[in-house]
Amino acid sequence: MSEKKNLFRLALSKLAEVKTYWKTPPSGKYVPFKEIAAYSVGGAGVYFIYSLVGQITLNAGSMIVGASIGIDAIDLQTMNALSILLGFLIAPARAMMFDNTRSKMGKFRPYILYMGLPTAIFSTAFVYMPYETMDYSKKCITVFIFYTLLQFFSPFYQAAYAGLVQVLSPNSAERGWIIEISSIIYSFAPTVINPVLPLIGDLENIQTYRIAFPIFCLLGIFVSMFCVFGTQERIIVPKSYVQKVGFIEGLKKVSKNKYFWIVNSSNWLGFLAGGAGYIFQWIFYYGMNNSSLYALMVVIKGEASTPGMALAAPLMNKFGKKKICLFSLSAQVFCLIMMLTCYKNYILVFVFIFLKDMVGALSIIYLPAMNADMMDYQQYKTGDRLEGFIGQTGPLLTSAISLVTGYAIPLILKNFGLTNNYSDLYDGDFRNPIVKAMIVYSIIGTLLSLIPYLFYDLDETKRGSMIKALKVRALFEDRLRNEISEEALVDTMKDIIEAEEILKNETEHKKADIDAAKIILAEVSKFTDSSSGSRINLELLKEEYFAKVNAEA
């Protein structure tokens, strides 16, 4: 009974906390709960649309394009390669538009507002094309045209939502918490869509998608408006800062970001891991041949992500992003190895698929958190907020590499006799060798994708010191223009004085704290050393700081 009372009291205290900080953030934080709710609920709208667009893929796992419309797996990859080549023209423009956008709404929210509707319209129009009356070549042309249109609008839409969280707060821990909350809420969209589709009709039947797409797209447009009009972008820059970055200049600056290369090289090395995405559908949709039971299993499988997402932020805060990342990938390898021993046993293989998805869901939190830290490092390194260039250059390079690596899985499937004859997957003798091969290649791909993260060294102490260095930069540049605020003065000078105290007594502090203090004071020296012309009088700023603190006391 006492345990229930304690839980009840805890729930009441949390509700009281939400009420208290609904419009005003807690001390030391930047984002009120109202804004977190708007970002999270709006994200469900974005993902209603994005999850449907995700059904339209040019690979062997696409039930719409492969099984329903009937395009050969090799032809799908060839169309994908052509789309990638066109993307080389689109992605740079998208990057420049993101990073040079200057509007009252910020740099990301305008694209959520304006790119959602065309994404919804073209995806719905795609499934309503009369494929039943088309010959094979016309099907290929139609699919390619619509896919190319979607690849212009959809990445704007999804990247804008993903990028928005990176500028909601400069506090990494707070960002991680927002990502966790929003991920749990917006995952409601695919959690609903994936089991509903097989209940509407067969996944090989285009009529199923003609019912689902307009309903969920319309719902998505309306719900996504919450994050457009209910959030605010916050970045630490001087008041006079106006960013304008050219394409070549942006690429040069991004190339100096080592964490950009670490995160993206993991994607490049892990191309074989994509085979794991086919396993569940092939084993349970084709193997069990029961749409209702398959829909139930999709619901259960979808819930595997929830504990992973819920645990990710506290685990990251305790162990750091790198350790959680390595644990997630290693645990997935273990689950794949176990699946290799039991893929013919529906119960056991489902257990390991569930566990793999659960530990894999940690990446839903730690990858955006790593990406946000990567943006902060970029600003610290070059002085620019390059979310657009980083967000588009990575996928662009990945696409270029996939012009070659993308043929690996289709060629493997072709070697096993699978092209567009998806109905043969109902036969266990045909299906099981392919499933086994996909598991083996997924193990190899996941192991390769783990290697780059061994070199990731941007821990919380180092990242926090970079944020403080950015505050120093903003404070001093504002000081030179007589635009300094008292709040910024107190906050930043406190960090500088603490850093000085650490270096005066190095023997009493950890190496990480000493290195962090050096990063902060190195930024100070850029504005105060004789080599810089002594532009800033640090002692005078200290006098102003202590006068302000004493006055408040």
Model feature map: region roles:
Residues 484-515:
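Acidic, Ser/Thr-rich low-complexity segments on the non-lumenal side of membrane proteins
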